[in-house]
Amino acid sequence: MKYLRMYLPPFAPDYSGVCSTLFELRGIVVIHDAGGCTGNYTGYDEPRWYGSKSAIFCSKLREMDAVLGLDNDLIEKIKNACTPETKFAAVLGSPVPMLIGSDMNGIATELESQINIPCIGLDTNGFNLYNKGISMAEKALAEIFVKDTNIKVQNGVNILGMTPIDFGLNENANDLKEMLKHWGYNIVACFSMGVKLDDIANAAKAKVNIVVSQGGMALAKIMETKYKIPYVAGIPMGDVGAEVFKKAVDNAIENNKSFVFGKDDYKIQTKDVVGKNIIFIGEQIQGNSWRGAYNKIHPHDNVQVGCIFGKDTSISIDYDLDISNENDIINLLSNEEYDIIIADPLIKQLIPKEKLNNIKFISFPHVAVSSKIYWDNIPLFIGDNMNKYLLD
């Protein structure tokens, strides 16, 4: 019963992360399911769906298809849906294909031999979370489309892990890009908002990767090994956070050294605190970035990150927490004492009522948690937009 939810909705699953990453790239994406999984993504996990065009389809999997394994019918459906403008095709799994052992990569290989465009098969299953789907999609895009090169773009940067699931559909993505341009950096490729496949093909020309969500970490590590491109994992929150962030990017370009904001520069490494005890419950790199910026202003306060989408130990400090199920969050908030909690508004109901008067709760909506209930209330968190939260 570990994953039973009594108060929180299910978090955005892996196939939603894949679809969100591929949304703007003019491919055709097919979720192999009976309809519910596709509707879950288009209805609840994708703020761009209404008012945009993207070829994301359901395979209309039926009982006899599952029993007999009629993969040829699926291949024919995808072939018929492709147009001359289709750049690639992606086939994604869901719970039923996982249970019957469907081979998504095999289906994609057979499909590619018949339509002569790149095809991607990903074994998503609906049980893993969206950040794993982002990782899977970015790795697949890089493997297929990124070209080896020794040429580097002057002050060239890639942005990894950027989707509306983490950034919302307000100005956060544009604000980050404009800040980077203002600092003199040239954006080579952004995975995957405001991007084309031609940009992704040139990604190896960058001098540093900027990782803005946990979903981008897998590709960052691959590109660090394969192309010797260092990464900076973090978001420039607040004026002080932007200052540290820029220095980290400059250092990565000059000295080929990776940096994790809110970990490598964090001063307090123990739970013995002098000031306030604070927890950021949400996406790990957002939490790290909050901590990194907040600690520069309030050096005696302790900021802990509660990772509700899984904890990546390579970007965490010792007492960060993996609280990826509801019961863990409830136990934490019942047993620990916090002065400030930063989290999605739906998390507030898990705080014991007798503690609410003594806690400052800062609302920080996340699409993967509260979906369309609060996605219009996602704060602007790039640069000085965050000063009002960090300076208080």
Regions found by a protein language model. Name each.
Residues 1-392:
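An N-terminal assembly and electron-transfer interface module characteristic of large anaerobic redox
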